[in-house]
Amino acid sequence: MAPGIYTVTVSFVGLEEKEITVTAPQPDRSLTEVLMEEGEEEDEEAVVVTATRISRTIANIPTRVEVISGEELTEKGNMKPGDIRMLLNESTGIQTQQTSATSFNAGIRIQGLEGRYTQILRDGYPLYSGFSGGLSILQIAPLDLRQVEVIKGAASTLYGGGAIAGLVNLVSKTPGRDREISFLANGTSAGGLDLSGFYSQRYCKAGLTLFASRNSNRPFDPADIGLTAIPKFERYTINPRLFLYGKNTTADVGATYITEDRTGGSMNYIKNGDNGFFEKNKTDRITTQVGIAHKLTEHATLQFKNSYSRFDRVITIPTYTFDALQQSSFSEFTWNRKGEKADWIIGANVLTDDLKEQGQTPDPKRDYRYNTYGLFVQNAWSISERVVLETGLRGDYVNEFGFELLPRVSAMFRVTPNLTTRIGGGFGYKTPTIFTEEAERIQFQNLFPIDINRSRNERSVGGNWDINYRTNLGDVGFSLNHLFFYTKLNNPLVLVGAPGGKVQFQNATDYLDTKGMETNLRLTYGDFKLFVGYTLTDANTHFANTREWLPLTARHRLNNVLMYEIEDKLKLGLEAYHFSRQRLSDGTFGKPYWITGFMAEKLWEQFSVFINFENFTDTRQTKFDTIYTGTINNPVFRDIYAPVEGFVVNGGIKIRL
């Protein structure tokens, strides 16, 4: 090396790249020490999780929690800026199931169980339960999210009934040290337009966040069959949130308003007003959240949380209208103590859920009012540097369905610095409801209300065990996670025939179960990252001594994602997902299929442009199967198990000020 001054770039897997200046030759041939900071690989273990109620990093939580944050959250937001379907669907063990061929409505399935068994939270508030869960994942935009936390398996001990399959906690951005102003504009080849903006700033004793968006789509029929694959819709969202910071007390107050008009069905009806089948959804959603935390001592905190939700939805088809208003509330007091080795939380909460049908209907009114009163205690105990134990117990009393006792336990063992294993399990329950995927498909027509005298809570027991290994193989970062899971659901609610051509829900006398495994492999080399995931889901009903596949659950699923990233300059991503055949509700089987995608983003200091080629192989159910029987004006829709929108290109610009 010729004498002179050189700039040397030092890098190592798992550590941040660093540039240093050296002089050659070194006069005393001494070694130059370089202090490097932990990079992204380690930062993942340092993410603080809130869904477990006891705020610890992922590395110190016995409960298995998956977190979608940072670059991954941003990349998924580029692909689908208008909602969180893709964000969730591309994780192992999670499938977003389309429940309506024309309205595009979808629910979340975790490990094969229907969407009603998954609890969706916003910053720990249960804002999307019952009737308000309809269209929920289609109306949540990802731009103002900091991270998404997913717990798979029984989690009712944490937040009450409904979390039999698991829970999804959507964690919002909060004001940081630096002001954040961002805007996004996105257009799609399917006639979609997404416009959104986010503002965040912290002042001395106060902070503010503000999110606003407009999302719309023209009716889209790529199969040219005369029915919408993507409906015509227009949605507006506004979400202000105020934060107050005192010496010992902090508070935040927020509100959200979402209004949407959505019309799917006959293209001739939507465009020209001609006769034909249609499904209209008019929704207005108002939610408020209040949180107060007071520091009692150096280690103890008292918290109060309250939320209110008003959800008004009108569903109209040519022969029927379902018009209902749901009002629900959540109030909770908790005492938290963080110790040197053990963390405690003790709390009580009250949930109310009130539904009233509005207008005239030929069906009996499905009105109800449920009140749930809960007490819970939870402890996380670091027994040693290698063993952490988490235990919890909840008691819930539901006014119409009685008392539920919900124990839960999880343990984490650090076998070596690179090898960790977690094992856990618990009980769960779900209050009977008419708001299921099956009822959504028939727009709640000819459906009797829940008979509270003959119905009881659906009860579950489940557990999981995972092994996580991380190391460096030369210049290659390597991590492998393998999960085994099992859930048994006793007396599930099923839809059966009733007199007069009606249908009703009743508890089955038997059970259903789901078991399987998930494998996630991650490799990093330089600017490349490879993610490979495999899910085996063996979900079955066991009714009348007969074992059958649970409908609309892919037994085998493969996720492949290859990313190339030059930090703060360029991102490229290639994806391929495989779904094996699925049993349909009519007893037939759908065909297996692949979905592929490619995205690119070019970044500058204050803005970036992105483009995404989603499903560029144009996989569509209408290519290899039908989505309805009967006539175009009076269709009887079949299960939707594959994409119906086909190949869609979207692209846009993001501005950061």
Task: Cite the ranges covered by each PLM segment.
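Flexible loop and strand-edge segments within Gram-negative outer membrane beta-barrel domains
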Residues: 217-236, 245-303, 308-328
